């Protein structure tokens, strides 16, 4: 009797050319897991704007990484033959808990696998990775917005209000961006104010970033300086991880994201900060392949775990804006 499915001759873990029950041993879950993570890291804005040094220390959901915050050392003047004052070191312990998880699961039918020219492994891997990225970015960005210092120092400019003004104060109104009516705050001026607030807290200039939704970048492109024109960006479009420019603007690496949570009344919100402000840890914990008991196909599923903690609230600034 002739075989309907030919045994796989794939020696490169090419999932789209192999069938479980035939010669499917070339599909290795560990290789698949690395493939997902590779797509993920190329897409995630959060990976680019947070401290990921602790990612290698997690191995399971619920893991906790203890972080010792750097002590502040006082400097005093010195006069010859006099005693010097000393600083007693105090350590502050912070926890980064991996307490969030997302999963993906899909089925690759045997017939689709063998009869289609589409590489289902690549298509499904890319789709799963971008879905994980969206969920991860949205959750961590929301936590970062919540973690912005709102007193001593107050780094929240405006509020989620439909009423706007041009003062850029920490009041109940949102910021009125310069629009078609010719009035309001230039988007670049708002960025300059956010940079100054970071300067006031001695936040290092190297490693600063700015993230905003597309509506803000539309206003920024119409700014009087035209700094985001094609000429400024050397003819390049979006590069990777949401980075929108090869150069810095007001000292910030510029990122664009659709995963900033929607506002209730304002047109949108933006955030700026330093890469040391927030620690994150994430990993593709496991992937599995098993036969679907109800059809002829393979179930592929994976588990992504992560955690985030705002370590330096003073190194974040947020602002709410209204576009006329």
Q: Which ranges hold each PLM region?
A:
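Alpha-helical scaffold segments that mediate packing/assembly in large oligomeric complexes
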Residues: 111-196, 320-324
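Sequence/fold signature of self-assembling virion shell proteins
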Residues: 2-51, 56-74, 95-97, 115, ...
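Generic detector of well-ordered alpha-helical segments enriched in charged/polar residues
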Residues: 28-29, 33-37, 41, 141, ...
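Short Gly/aromatic-enriched secondary-structure transition segments
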Residues: 80-87
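Short, catalytically relevant binding-site loops at active-site mouths
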Residues: 146, 215-219, 260-262
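Structured, hydrophobic secondary-structure cores that serve as assembly/anchoring elements
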Residues: 61-66, 72, 85, 92-120, ...
């Amino acid at each position: 009797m002739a075989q309907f499915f030919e045994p796989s001759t794939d020696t490169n873990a090419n999932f789209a050319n192999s069938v479980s029950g035939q010669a499917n041993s070339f599909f290795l879950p560990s290789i698949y897991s690395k493939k997902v993570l590779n797509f993920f890291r190329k897409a995630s804005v959060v990976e680019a704007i947070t401290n990921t040094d602790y990612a290698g220390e997690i191995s399971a959901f619920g893991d906790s990484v203890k972080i010792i915050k750097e002590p502040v050392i006082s400097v005093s003047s010195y006069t010859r033959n006099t005693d010097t004052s000393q600083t007693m070191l105090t350590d502050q312990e912070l926890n980064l808990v991996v307490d969030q998880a997302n999963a993906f699961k899909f089925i690759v039918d045997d017939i689709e696998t063998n009869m289609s020219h589409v590489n289902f492994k690549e298509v499904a891997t890319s789709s799963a990775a971008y879905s994980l990225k969206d969920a991860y970015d949205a959750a961590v960005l929301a936590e970062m917005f919540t973690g912005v210092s709102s007193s001593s120092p107050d780094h929240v400019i405006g509020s989620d209000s439909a009423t706007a003004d041009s003062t850029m104060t920490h009041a109940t109104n949102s910021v009125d961006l310069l629009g078609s009516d010719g009035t309001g705050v230039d988007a670049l001026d708002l960025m300059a104010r956010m940079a100054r607030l970071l300067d006031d807290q001695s936040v290092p200039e190297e490693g600063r970033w700015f993230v905003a939704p597309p509506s803000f970048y539309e206003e920024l492109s119409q700014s009087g300086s035209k700094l985001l024109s094609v000429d400024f960006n050397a003819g390049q479009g979006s590069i990777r991880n949401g980075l929108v420019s090869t150069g810095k603007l007001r000292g910030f690496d510029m990122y664009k994201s659709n995963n900033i949570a929607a506002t209730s009344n304002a047109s949108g919100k933006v955030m700026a900060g330093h890469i040391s402000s927030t620690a994150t840890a994430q990993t593709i914990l496991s992937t599995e392949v098993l036969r679907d008991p109800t059809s002829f196909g393979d179930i592929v599923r994976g588990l992504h775990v992560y955690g985030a903690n705002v370590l330096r609230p003073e190194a974040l600034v947020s602002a709410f804006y209204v576009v006329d």
